[in-house]
Amino acid sequence: FRMYLQNVKKSSENTILSYLRDLRGFCGFMEGLGVCEVSKINRTNIMAYVYELQNQHKASTTIFRNLASIRAFFYFLMGQGVVKENPAVDLELPREERKVPKIMTLEQVEKLLEQPKTSDAKGLRDKAMLEVLYATGIRVSELVSLHVDDVNLPFEYIRCTTGSKSRMIPIGTKAKEALWEYLKKGRVQLIHNPEETVLFLNYGGKKMTRQGFWKIVKNYAEEAGIPGEITPHGRVIIRTS
């Protein structure tokens, strides 16, 4: 792999040393999981390593570099015929929890997320949707298109599919807890067809629409006393008058 980086990728010596150091840490973690063959490593294993780095309070830049190192290593292995695909492709990092959007204050964000009343199915659903949307930054169209099997609570990530492309996105503790409550207590009350796989359901047991979700968010924003208009594009436009 070192020769590949040096001769094919034309990487600098510092970059090579960083990649090798990252891979030593990654391989050590895999051994701890009992995964001793690179062909057995999957996306879930890599996500577990990402969370381990986050638990160690590593900087986002460090974690991104580790992912780049792992991704480059698996591309090398593909070229050598050792593996057939790269499990590190399309993995993304979550936003830091409770990071304040530029157009909303922390108090406003907290108020919005606290509006759903989790004493009923609707509130549990709305709470989960808001937490997932805020933690991941995915589009509303992607949010309402999620299916139950896109959620992995043990490793705290969702699989988001757009067209033929899928990516795995960590969700963090707050969103995980909200999803767990919704799946355990809320969705079972909304589902009409046992074979329905869509994650977020309306009262008719069908997939939530993008427009329906934004109407709900707008109502919560009004209840929270947040100035500005919630738009279908997901922005809060602050009024200046």
Where are these regions (language model features)?
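Conserved catalytic core of the tyrosine transesterase superfamily
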Residues: 1-241
